[in-house]
Amino acid sequence: MNVKYFQFGILFFLFYYPVYSQKDTSKKQVIDIISSFKPVIRNTSKVNFSATYLSSDSSKYLAPYNIPSLNLFFVYKPISLQPLALNMDSVLDLGIRNFLKIGYGNLSNPFAKANFNFGNGINSLINLSANYFSSKGSIKNQDYSQFKANLNGSYFSASNEIFGKLGLNLQDNYFYGYDHSVLNYSKQDVLQRFDEIQGLVGVKNKVVNDLGINYSPFLQVTLFNNYLKLKENSFKFVVPVEKSLGETYSVKLSVKTDINSYSSKNSIEDIHFNNTIFQLTPEFIYNNKLLTVHGGLSPSWDNGQFLLLPNFYGQVKINDLPLKLQFGYTGQLISNSYRNLSLNNPYLIPFTRQQNTKEKDLFFGIKSFSGSHISYSVKFSYLHYNNLPLYINDTINDNKSFLISSESEINNLQFKADISYVISDQFALTSSMTYNGFSDLKDNQKPWGTIPFEFINSFRWQATNKFIFKSDFKFFTGAPFLLKYNIDKSISNGADLSMGAEYSINKKFSAWIDINNIFNNKYERWHNYQVYGINILGGFIVKF
């Protein structure tokens, strides 16, 4: 059996070998490996989120938004002192578009102020504001009241802004500066009522036109009336035009016309006169990174009398220093209308004539800043006046009113300085001082009614987003005044401190308080006109 298998194997080998010898060996040999194993990536486990709710968080999130601090240079303008020591207007209303502010004080003085805004501020904007205030002092007829309303509007086109204003001002003062032990006047006898309506319209370009010209002309009309005594109408037209001649040079021309018509009422002598000022102010301007110079002469006409006034001023920037040197020699004509002078002294009697003031100012000063928050300026001026109005008591009658005595020629060596520390809109501390050294008078013994020295300090602090605190302090040396028989004296110095605060209760309501004349210093700005003592007012503001 085994032999058979062996023989069969030999025969198979002999048969298969020739066949295998015929196989093509020129091709590559390939070995196929077949496997049932298949590699796969392992599935990762998913994160399982908790079904519990997050806890509520009602805290207010304040996103960081840093605004660079601004260095502001404040300009202080003289204001008249009313029987109330300080102006009751509050800076705390800034940023509120529509509000009603009401209050009451210890001097039987109601206070109300309202402000409304309309328009989107892009195509048009209209602002309507009104305020009323009155007070009653301890002296007979030491009363005061004022109602003011203003309508301001602007229309914005692609290249111009058309603006206008309509204002109403009703003000009651009283001549209470007489000897009350001798004279007994009724309230109507000493009433000094001013009624004023003022309108203004103008246009100014928003972008420089193809000719490279900037312009901003306006027309102002004022109707002023002193109850049963006088009326005065004024017309003012100003056209400033500026054209650029490149990056360094430009020219500017300003045309000014100021016309007043004055007439008395219910007086023994019928008084009527016109007062006209016409002034041309051409300027050639040179401006580069370090130097700015304005140069020119100003032909002017004062009631037909020709005057040529200087108009040269400029500033130099000190390289690599935060310092600017200012210099100049300028001149101007100042309209001494009854309205303008009564803003300074409301106890004037009617005019019999009117003279405008010619002013020439030779000055030098510096303006600078230190760090990011402090700015300051200093200015020395040598002023020369012609026909400067001085205020003297009417000693011929009852000494309760004032006359105008024009000084034909007077010099003033003036020094001004101011400094401010400002941190954005959160904190502001400003101080200013003015010294006047009048000399070389020709017609008057002293500069009656002028203040030799004045210091003003103002403080504003937004402690939180709901609480704001403010404070104002003023000190001045008394003005010289004239008594009977040419006896001259000076008013005692005056100091006035006021404080105020406002607290926002919610988005709609705020509470405010003002305390004026904290020292209870019953000083005088004008002889025989003592101001109120301490005055406390408080109330609420409704915002909507």
Residues of each region from the PLM?
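Bacterial Sec-dependent N-terminal signal peptides
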Residues: M1-T25, Y249, L323, F459, ...
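Outer-membrane beta-barrel transmembrane domain signature of Gram-negative proteins
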Residues: D189-G202, F218-K289
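Exposed, low-structure sequence patches enriched in small/polar residues
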Residues: G95, L100-G103, N131, L290-T292, ...
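Flexible loop and strand-edge segments within Gram-negative outer membrane beta-barrel domains
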Residues: S135-Q142, K148-N150, F163-N214, Q220-S234
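Surface-exposed extracellular loop regions of Gram-negative outer-membrane beta-barrel proteins
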Residues: N117-S135, S250-N260, K265, E269-S300, ...
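N-terminal periplasmic/intermembrane-space "pro-region" immediately following the signal or transit peptide
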Residues: S21-S90
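Outer-membrane beta-barrel translocator/receptor signature
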Residues: S80-A85, S90-A149
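Short loop/turn motifs that connect adjacent beta-strands in outer-membrane beta-barrel proteins
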Residues: M88-G95, N120-N123, F156-E161, V207-Y215, ...
